[in-house]
Amino acid sequence: MFNLLKQVSDYAKESIEAAKYIGQGLSVTFDHMRRRPVTVQYPYEKLIPSERFRGRIHFEFDKCIACEVCVRVCPINLPVVDWEFNKAVKKKELKHYSIDFGVCIFCGNCVEYCPTNCLSMTEEYELATYDRHELNYDNVALGRLPYKVTEDPMVTPLRELGYLPKGVLDPHDLPSGNQRSGKRPEEIIAESD
């Protein structure tokens, strides 16, 4: 009889301990449910890169003096610099410059050590292609400036979307003269602050 009571009390203690552990796990889950989402719905929402973001390299052909410092400081000797010596002026003339972004590690050494600042990092990070040879950018492709994330044609239409007014479940129930269905996300955030 005493052994049976001991087993029942042990079972009760273990049940209480299990419930405590489940409660701890659920408290963490509920804590995370109250937080704002960290992720974005890419490509419709894009985070604006930080100021020191190292994206695709921008190259200015006219500033380059073909010194090849960028090749020497690159850990993988990546930039290809073709030049010709002009005997009349006694200077190097740049003929061709290219970088293969399929191999580039975006360390930024070439940008930092360039004496004429003809190289700079941009905020462009969407370089994915179906053919790896398209990642080999020549001086023409490196020279074009990328568009800003805030001016992206995929993101811009989303700014015009609004929420339905409170209590309206179907957008067809709105009055015909109403141009926008509700408040924009920026307006809702401004009201809450």
Curated annotation (Swiss-Prot):
Its main location: membrane. GO terms for biological process: photosynthesis, light reaction. It is a peripheral membrane protein. Keywords: 4Fe-4S, Iron, Iron-sulfur, Membrane, Metal-binding, NAD, NADP, Plastoquinone, Quinone, Repeat, Thylakoid, Translocase. Residues 55-84, 95-124 form the 4Fe-4S ferredoxin-type domain. NDH-1 is composed of at least 11 different subunits. This is NAD(P)H-quinone oxidoreductase subunit I. It comes from Rippkaea orientalis (strain PCC 8801 / RF-1) (Cyanothece sp. (strain PCC 8801)). The gene is ndhI.
